[in-house]
Regions:
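STAS-like cytosolic regulatory interaction modules
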Residues: 1-54, 58, 64-110
């Protein structure tokens, strides 16, 4: 499956749209995209997992590391994962990632 991390700015928020499988092989691509976004010191960064089809422990670890990096740079990091994305919601819940970084079920960008 094709993996893609697409940066965007929506309503003043830096957004990384993650498409495909976030796993051991693709987590480094997300890490690089997060570093690039944090290098410009956004006040907030949303990692949009709406189109993420699979998440393993390596991908979840990368999300937790991104949260730590964001805190260190003064950026508020949030994950966006709608309830319809059951496979990713399940992993986020099992690993209690919501205790590390807020997980939004929907977002309105203004």
């Amino acid at each position: 499956m094709l993996f893609e991390v697409e940066p965007a700015t929506v309503g003043g928020h830096a957004v990384l749209r993650v498409r495909g499988e976030l796993d051991l092989l693709t987590a480094p691509q997300l890490a690089q995209a997060v570093q690039t976004q944090l290098s410009v010191s956004p006040s907030s960064l949303i990692i949009d997992l709406t189109d993420t089809t699979f998440l393993d422990s390596s991908g979840a670890r990368q999300l937790a590391l991104a949260a730590r990096q964001a805190r260190g740079s003064g950026t508020v990091l949030q994950l966006l994962c709608p309830p319809g994305n059951k496979p990713v919601q399940l992993v986020l819940g099992l690993l209690e990632l919501g205790k590390v970084v807020p997980v939004l079920e929907s977002a309105t960008f203004s």
